[in-house]
């Protein structure tokens, strides 16, 4: 995931279920479950929700409260980052709310990564693909990688 300057503005409080996330000089609030944040009506906040596919599987029914909360994000100037390694397992009702989708791959030999920012669309074979809008090519930055433990298990939502 590539975060632009807008996401790093120091006055934006961050809510996350990633307990190991520590960013110097940032106000971070940790939560356990989606139910802990759906009543949050604060303006101009960042919500980072890891392993969203553990809470909402491909066949699950729509969570109307969470869906409504997501739809209100634009009006409340919220940035919501839903993280999953199983994009195809996220239900369609949740994919439809996404404004952008980021997908990252590592180049085979070099320690270089490519992240595509784009829109998820169904191709002719009914497979989800990303229509790239922007491409980021980068080498991982140890400073950023040290913000959280990428191996931290997220067991509840």
What are these regions (language model features)?
Residues 10, 24, 96-98:
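Short, structured coil segments at secondary-structure junctions
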Residues 1-2, 31-36, 65-68, 87-89:
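A generic local structural motif
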Residues 15-43:
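Short glycine-rich substrate-engagement loop in P-loop NTPases that contacts/grips substrate
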Residues 11-13, 43-46, 76-83:
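Loop/turn-to-beta-strand initiation segments
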Residues 48-50:
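Conserved proline-anchored active-site loop of SAM-dependent methyltransferases
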Residues 1-9:
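Glycine-rich P-loop/Walker A and Walker A-like loops and their local beta1-loop-alpha1 context
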Residues 116-157:
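RecA-like P-loop NTPase motor core
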């Amino acid at each position: 995931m590539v975060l632009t300057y807008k996401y790093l503005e120091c006055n934006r409080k961050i809510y996350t279920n990633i307990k190991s996330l520590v960013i110097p000089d940032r106000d971070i609030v940790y939560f356990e479950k989606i139910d802990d944040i759906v009543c949050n009506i604060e303006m101009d906040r960042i919500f980072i929700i890891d392993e969203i596919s553990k809470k909402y599987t491909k066949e699950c029914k729509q969570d109307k409260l969470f869906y409504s909360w997501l739809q209100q994000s634009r009006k409340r100037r919220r940035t919501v980052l839903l993280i999953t390694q199983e994009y195809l397992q996220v239900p369609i009702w949740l994919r439809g709310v996404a404004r952008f989708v980021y997908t990252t791959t590592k180049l085979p030999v070099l320690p270089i990564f490519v992240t595509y920012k784009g829109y998820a669309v169904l191709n002719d074979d009914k497979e989800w693909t990303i229509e790239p809008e922007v491409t980021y090519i980068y080498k991982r930055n140890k400073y950023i990688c040290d913000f959280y433990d990428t191996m931290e298990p997220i067991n509840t939502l």
